[in-house]
Amino acid sequence: MTKKNLAVCSFCGRSEKDVEKLIAGPSVYICDYCIKLCSGILDKTPAPATQEIATSSTSSPTSLRVLTPKEIKRHIDSYVIGQERAKKTISVAVYNHYKRIRALMQDKQVGYGKSNVLLLGPTGSGKTLIAKTLAKILDVPFTIADATTLTEAGYVGEDVENIVLRLLQAADYDVARAERGIIYIDEIDKIGRTTANVSITRDVSGEGVQQALLKIIEGTVANIPPKGGRKHPNQEYIRVNTENILFIVGGAFVNLDKIIAKRLGRTTIGFSEETDLAVTNRDHLLAKVETEDLIAFGMIPEFIGRFNCIVNCEELTLDELVEILTEPANAIVKQYTELFEEENVKLIFEKEALYAIAQKAKQAKTGARALGMILENLLRDLMFEIPSDPTVEAIRIEEDTITQNKPPVIIQKSPEAIA
């Protein structure tokens, strides 16, 4: 290696051959000599008050306030409509999980493990929103990962350790905070092994990924590369203990109801998938899910065994979709109403129009996710025109606006008001 190719300390300029250890950071290096020098300076300098507060928030046993299950559910209710059974189950699981962490921080003996959660349910039923809301009310770092992008080590794709890296980034590289965070892994059903995956080729995105995830979910000290592992193989690793990280995984698990029905000796109802009766029957079956059903679906026993809380999110009803439009603290209709109020224009939705929007979302088969797209398409042209038109006083959205694509009703200001 030539002199110009040697990495050097960004502070003192010593090359890697002149020091015992050279630690790499994002685009910088620091040697062991400079670390010792900085450490000596810090030992002689009183820490600022803000640093003392931060330290106390991560290490003090009393700093972790555990909300009761009722308090947790009440907060979730402010943002998540429906899913009463799921919200109660998760509230209890999260309460027990953080109560366990607090006990461990106080050096108490704990005889129960952590409460990882597996959420079943169709797209747009609120699985991700529940996880996001939990992280918000508990004030802990949170990250979302997509299971379909994960692969085993050695294959093209994302290493499972990168999930922990994203949580560490969400915690601003505060390891103690990250170790109490929440990781939500979506589309977990997509990594179920299938009978088609015979031994001719390696099951890159199925059983192998479950095995890789198993280690960090059950709890291990993971070596996390701060820049990601594959493009920067020589960087210094950060050690993160995943034992107290809460893992929530979710997936639609399409046709799992048929596996459950077979176990129960039932036949699935012979109606169209869109009928309310078929949906009710499917939700009823998923509520009876057992570990053996998930194994038959393609999840490995060791993986499923790490989730002692398995709960079903039911498909949202028409009334619940209407509530989602108007009731939560961050309801989408409230958001658009505020946008138009900033232009001094009143936005009015007739009740029939709200139900028409909900029906359209239901037909799209993406649950609550379709609501935002429908409203955006409906109001985009108005949001373009209104800022340039001071004559508009109000806009009324009627049922025909949704069902027959008729223009919204524009109510003009009186001439006196314009003047």
Curated annotation (Swiss-Prot):
Component of the ClpX-ClpP complex. Forms a hexameric ring that, in the presence of ATP, binds to fourteen ClpP subunits assembled into a disk-like structure with a central cavity, resembling the structure of eukaryotic proteasomes. The lineage of its organism: Bacteria, Pseudomonadati, Chlamydiota, Chlamydiia, Chlamydiales. ATP binds at P122, T123, G124, S125, G126, K127, T128, L129. SMART domains: AAA, ClpB_D2-small, zf-C4_ClpX. Keywords: ATP-binding, Chaperone, Metal-binding, Nucleotide-binding, Zinc. CDD domains: RecA-like_ClpX (cd19497). The keyword Chaperone applies. It holds the Pfam family ClpB_D2-small. One of its GO terms (biological process) is proteolysis involved in protein catabolic process. Belongs to the ClpX chaperone family. Residues 1-50 form the ClpX-type ZB domain. It comes from Chlamydia trachomatis serovar A (strain ATCC VR-571B / DSM 19440 / HAR-13). This is ATP-dependent Clp protease ATP-binding subunit ClpX. InterPro entries: AAA+_ATPase, ATP-dep_Clp_protease_ClpX, ATPase_AAA_core, Clp_ATPase_C, Clp_protease_ATP-bd_su_ClpX, ClpX_bact, P-loop_NTPase, Znf_CppX_C4. ATP-dependent specificity component of the Clp protease. It directs the protease to specific substrates. Can perform chaperone functions in the absence of ClpP. One of its GO terms (molecular function) is ATP hydrolysis activity. Zn(2+) binds at C9, C12, C31, C34. One of its GO terms (cellular component) is HslUV protease complex.
